[in-house]
């Protein structure tokens, strides 16, 4: 059971009473009157997702979404052969074709939500053209989608699918696409399709249900969709199906072990027990998800950036920060964090989502969002077209930025920022709202007694520490507004209409302000940031430098070498004949300055770290995009020393970290650090110099 812990309550009077409470979790004794939450007997949700479209992004997140629209996400259907509508099993009238597996729903999952967030009519129409085919594909027995898949798991027996059974994994993704469409459109055909499909699933014998590798690992996504439908229809047979799905899914509740160590599976599937916990209310399942999260990181995640080393699979002995993770893994981790946050209310998951979103995911794509790479690492001195195996697990050009390549990540990247934007605000069980992932936006929602309000948030967070919120409302409304205090912040301050509030500023908490809010009210939140260091004893005692939610990398001058996307593509890549490599080039990124620096121990041991790690600021970028090496609005100046023996190794990667403390006779130099999300070549885990 999630306990509600009230730290202190203070009453403060303006014209009417305002109640201010610091809580570690929201109370779930009430049920939100306006937005779909968990029905009985499911465990009540701590926070409730608002329908897509209720949040209008602004500031840098809007710019990022526009870059997606104008870049790879918005135009991948012109490039990828898997998205070609000709003879596509997802688009055909008879559910047959020579291609059609996970790629279409992967792409559509983020493409559609991006369309709804930006209210882009052209993209919405394109989304609907696919979903109309999906809805019409449903057979009389309830199954929908391609009759057979041509992917790694198909109706043809292979290593992943030895029995040659129909693979349900692609349908799991498409169900999420349909749910977003229903949120946006209220098209009841989605509910009808899901009911009939789940009745079909109910009839599949356990002996042939969720048998192949991907669907077996990722059955939690199927489980999530069952609960989504149950919360709308209340049909009790769906809870029986949920038990069946959980029982036939890989066991993510093992103690000190995982069913497999594939990076995307771990990032995506560790949430499965917590999802099932909503039905059982048995804390064993909730704790299992926390255990899975901690287990992978205790061995392979002793690195900055929030992820772990599994450049396909986590491998014994490959724990250095030069090991990377797939772009797929990053966006699935963000989605898992958002779901865990709604289930548990634990602000840890918001902190972690930001850690990945700000520090790891931006570096996986080009600044113009027209290309991406398969693998990104916390320490990455080169991003080229060479084969780096076995330094990384797979053979091939996995480090190159290439819009024609990286089949799974090429399509699955789309969900990252749209899902983040949809979770910036959430509804609360007591008919309020929570500012969860701070970013510029307008949220319009029903609150209190049913009044509709808009809250306009303006901020440059995480590059600045101030967040401003303005109330826009036709009528006053009494409702609670929750403001998250991150774990790294120990002295948050809040003002309402220029009056400072008195409250207990507690890291990893929420400040709940219940008030009669009226048009023109404004709230100002200041989240003071300070330099903090993280030591990694399990990774050669290296160190990383943090400022608020941002982790910093050595600034390495990056040379971008344009290349033909066809020449540097992975062997499995396929593109449409009309795809123009001149319009969509690939890039190698080569360092033009030294990358092999360490930080002297004496710099780290000073009482006042701000003296040796001086935070500097530049003007906000005119294009509203802060994740670029040359234009990031914040940087740190400190001292470092070159380590001549730390070089590129025989696999073409930066060598593993030397054990700290390191002895070197090189001269002390002034070095510049930038947010690691803006560094596509990066050193973010530094050796410590004696």
Question: Where would I find each of the regions flagged by the language model?
Answer:
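Low-complexity, Ser/Thr/Pro/Gly-enriched N-terminal "stalk/linker" regions
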Residues: 15-103, 124, 128-150, 188
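C-terminal beta-rich recognition modules with glycine/proline-rich loops and embedded aromatic residues
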Residues: 18, 23-30, 289, 350-359, ...
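Long, well-ordered core segments of solenoidal/helical folds
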Residues: 26, 60-91, 126-143, 192-209, ...
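Structural helix-adjacent loops and short alpha-helical linkers that scaffold large soluble proteins
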Residues: 45-57, 115-128, 181-195, 230-243, ...
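Extended ligand-binding groove/face enriched in aromatic
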Residues: 93-97, 115-245, 255
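Well-ordered alpha-helical segments within folded domains of soluble proteins
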Residues: 100-116, 166-182, 215-231, 262-278, ...
């Amino acid at each position: 059971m999630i306990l509600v812990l009230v730290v202190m309550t203070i009453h403060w009077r303006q014209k009417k009473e305002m109640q201010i409470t610091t809580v570690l979790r929201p109370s779930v004794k009430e049920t939100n009157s306006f937005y779909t939450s968990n029905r009985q007997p499911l465990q009540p949700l701590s926070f409730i997702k608002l329908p897509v479209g209720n949040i209008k992004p602004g500031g840098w997140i809007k710019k990022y979404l526009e870059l997606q629209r104008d870049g790879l996400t918005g135009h991948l259907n012109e490039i990828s052969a898997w998205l070609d509508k000709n003879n596509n099993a997802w688009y055909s009238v008879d559910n047959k074709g020579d291609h059609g597996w996970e790629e279409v729903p992967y792409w559509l999952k983020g493409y559609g939500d991006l369309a709804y967030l930006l209210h882009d009519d052209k993209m919405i129409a394109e989304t609907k053209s696919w979903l109309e085919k999906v809805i019409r594909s449903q057979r009389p027995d309830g199954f929908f989608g391609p009759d057979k898949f041509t992917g790694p798991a198909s109706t043809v027996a292979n290593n992943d699918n030895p029995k040659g059974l129909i693979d349900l994994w692609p349908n799991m993704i498409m169900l999420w696409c349909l749910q977003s469409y229903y949120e946006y459109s209220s098209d009841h055909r989605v509910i009808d399709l899901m009911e009939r499909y789940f009745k079909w699933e109910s009839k599949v014998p356990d002996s042939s249900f969720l048998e192949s590798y991907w669907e077996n690992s990722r059955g939690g996504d199927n489980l999530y969709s069952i609960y989504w439908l149950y919360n709308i229809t209340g049909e009790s047979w769906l809870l029986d199906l949920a038990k069946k799905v959980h029982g036939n899914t890989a066991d993510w509740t093992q103690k000190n072990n995982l069913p497999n160590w594939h990076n995307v599976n771990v990032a995506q599937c560790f949430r499965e027990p917590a999802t099932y916990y909503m039905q059982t209310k048995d804390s064993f399942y909730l704790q299992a998800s926390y255990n899975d999260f901690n287990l992978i990181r205790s061995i392979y995640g002793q690195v900055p950036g929030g992820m772990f080393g599994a450049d396909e699979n986590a491998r014994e002995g490959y724990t250095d920060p030069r090991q990377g993770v797939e772009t797929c893994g990053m966006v699935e981790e963000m989605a898992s964090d958002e779901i865990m946050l709604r289930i548990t209310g634990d602000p840890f998951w918001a902190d972690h989502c930001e850690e990945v979103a700000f520090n790891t995911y931006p570096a996986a794509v080009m600044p113009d969002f027209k290309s991406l790479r398969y693998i990104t690492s916390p320490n990455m001195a080169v991003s080229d077209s060479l084969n780096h195996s076995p330094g990384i697990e797979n053979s091939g050009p996995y480090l190159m930025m290439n819009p024609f390549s990286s089949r799974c990540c090429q399509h699955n990247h789309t969900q990252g920022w749209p899902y983040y934007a949809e979770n910036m605000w959430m509804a609360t069980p007591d008919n309020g709202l929570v500012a969860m992932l701070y970013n510029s936006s307008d949220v319009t929602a029903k609150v209190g007694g049913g009044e509709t309000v808009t809250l306009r948030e303006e901020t440059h967070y995480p590059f600045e520490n101030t967040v401003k919120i303005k109330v826009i409302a036709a009528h006053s409304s009494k409702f609670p507004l929750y403001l998250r205090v991150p774990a790294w912040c120990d002295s948050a301050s809040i003002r309402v209409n220029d009056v400072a509030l008195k409250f207990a500023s507690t890291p990893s908490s929420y400040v709940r302000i219940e008030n009669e809010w009226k048009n023109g009210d404004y709230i100002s939140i200041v989240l003071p940031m300070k330099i903090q260091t993280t030591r990694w004893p399990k990774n050669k005692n290296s160190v990383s430098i943090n400022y608020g939610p941002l982790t910093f990398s050595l600034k390495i001058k990056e040379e971008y070498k344009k290349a033909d996307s066809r020449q540097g593509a992975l062997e499995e890549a396929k593109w449409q004949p009309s795809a123009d490599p001149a319009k969509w080039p690939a890039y190698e990124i080569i360092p033009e300055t030294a990358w092999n620096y360490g930080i002297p121990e004496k710099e780290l041991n000073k009482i006042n770290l701000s003296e040796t790690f001086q935070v500097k600021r530049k003007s906000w970028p005119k294009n509203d995009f802060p994740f670029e090496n040359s234009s990031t609005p914040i940087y740190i100046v400190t001292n470092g020393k070159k380590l001549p023996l730390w070089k590129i190794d025989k696999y073409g990667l930066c060598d593993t970290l030397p054990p700290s403390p390191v002895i070197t006779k090189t001269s002390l130099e002034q070095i510049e650090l930038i947010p690691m999300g803006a560094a596509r070549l990066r050193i973010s885990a530094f050796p410590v110099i004696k």
